[in-house]
Amino acid sequence: MHLVIISGATRPQTKSNTAKIISAFRKGYEEIGNQTEVWYLSDRSQWESAAKAFEENENILIALPLYVENIPGILLEFLSGLKPKTTPGTKLSFLLQDGFPEACQSRCCEAYLEMLPGQLGCTYGGTLIKGDLFGLGLTGEKQREKLLAPFTDMGRYFAKTGRFEKDAVSRFAGPEYMPEKQIKMFNRFGRPVQRIFMGRISKKLGCSERLDAKPYEAFVK
């Protein structure tokens, strides 16, 4: 089975967490002889080819990061230029990733994605949701492989089922809400560790001041 994958991430492929997830997913999907083609909307030179692939194929997966509780603007712009299909048979599925540990943070976007295929003349193939992936591109290789391994498994699953069944993706998404006890533990012990971790990341990115610095405070009345 041939699968067209369209990445709706705004970051270039080399810097994109979504691209890393797509790579892991493809590995599992292609194990039994399936084929995939991937188009990255961060590269606008690929838009015409991506639109043509959408038009000519019947098995499509859009992978995207969560942006302000919904889809990235670059993906919305691309979708607005597509012509709805007039011939039935195309299945449109989604892979939604974000940095929040609770699956509930993605439900608003999921609701939008559920109605989107109908507007494009397609049937809905389900949405695979996974959060707590903010540090995916910042971890070491071994930890990154550990985080990506479940996506390879879901690639195998998708190759067999052809869609994301609700029960399977609900288990994959993780906790809908973090337990109160876990939140308290994080506030007590996790935040100091997080500050150290984010401080190291900021230095790698070229920051020379504290993350809580307020350089414009003196100008605010």
Language model segments and positions:
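N-terminal beta1-alpha1-beta2 submodule of the flavodoxin-like/Rossmannoid cofactor-binding fold
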Residues: M1-P88, R163-K221
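Hydrophobic, Leu/Ile/Phe/Ala-enriched alpha-helical segments that form helix-helix packing faces
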Residues: F25-Y29, L82, L113, P117, ...
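Short, glycine-/small-residue-rich phosphate/pyrophosphate-handling segment
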Residues: K91-K146
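Short flexible/disordered coil segments
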Residues: L96-C109, Y124, D153-E165, R188-S208
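Active-site oxyanion/phosphate-handling segment shared across diverse enzymes
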Residues: G135-P179
